[in-house]
Amino acid sequence: METTTTTLGGGGGGRAGGFSDPPSPLSPPLSPASAAAAALANARWTPTKEQIAVLEGLYRQGLRTPTAEQIQQITARLREHGHIEGKNVFYWFQNHKARQRQKQKQQSFDYFSKLFRRPPPLPVLHRPLARPFPLAMAPTAMPPPPPPPATTTTAACNAGGVMFRTPSFMPVATNNASYYPQQQTPLLYPGMEVCPHDKSTAQPPATTTMYLQAPPSSAHLAAAAGRGAAEAEGHGRRGGGAGGRETLQLFPLQPTFVLPDHKPLRAGSACAAVSPTTPSASASFSWESESSDSPSSEAPPFYDFFGVHSGGR
């Protein structure tokens, strides 16, 4: 069985053995006034309403970080409304600035959050129902339209309207106008006119000039009527009148042409003259009897249409 022996040595051995140093002597006790002052200094500051109102008024005036001299002046002023220290004034300004910055940041964050989350609705303007103009200023009737110029004549349909338009016409072409196209109209031949060969006359065709003219008026109608009458009279002269026309049979059984007395022709000869320049074609045919010993030249010639005398060829 082993025994443990403890060796007592100097101060170093006592610390090593677990013994502590002797306690230091206590500070002298405080007086009751000093103890009360220390308790007030360590106590939490509770500002009164008057002190808060004075400090907020200084902050609104632009005071943010007061100097040491300003802190002393403010502390002396606030002590009239309750207990306060200089450090309380300094910390109040620091905390109030931080709270204001935090409040502004929160307001900005809330504003942009609402803006991005859902746009605000468009404002609706509520207007009371009212007339476009007062009753005293309301016109009783529409003003009359301005009168047209004295030199122009307006259409009858625009007499009571608000728009007046002057009639315009194309200029009337002159006889020697070079910029109007001239062309010949085709001549129609309604029927074949038969007349003796010696009475056929060759006349130049009548050309018709077409112009772009203005709308018909009394002067233009009169001129057109005069031209139509002149042309009808000219055609009557050239055609020899309605009494000189004959209607030929499609398959005649007897000779239809008569030889002229003063102009003998050979047997079997045919003379057909058609004038292409006249508006109506004239044709004359003359036939002589096949037998040269005809007793009389006055007898009508005979023409074998069906080839009886020639053997049916």
Swiss-Prot record:
Domain of life according to the entry: Eukaryota
Any Pfam family the entry gives: Homeodomain
GO molecular function, one term: DNA binding
UniProt cross-references to CDD domains, sorted A to Z: homeodomain
GO-annotated cellular components: nucleus
One GO term (biological process): plant organ development
Gly residues bias locations: 8-17
Chain intervals with Pro residues compositional bias: 22-31
Main location: nucleus
InterPro entries attached to this UniProt entry: HD (IPR001356), Homeodomain-like_sf (IPR009057), WUSCHEL-like (IPR044555)
Annotated keywords: Developmental protein, DNA-binding, Homeobox, Nucleus, Transcription, Transcription regulation
Region named Disordered: 1-32, 224-247, 271-313
DNA-binding region: 40-104
Composition bias, Low complexity: 271-301
Localization per Swiss-Prot or TrEMBL: Nucleus
The family this protein is said to belong to: Belongs to the WUS homeobox family.
Function: Transcription factor which may be involved in developmental processes.
Protein name (Swiss-Prot/TrEMBL): WUSCHEL-related homeobox 5
Source organism: Oryza sativa subsp. indica
Designated gene of the protein: WOX5
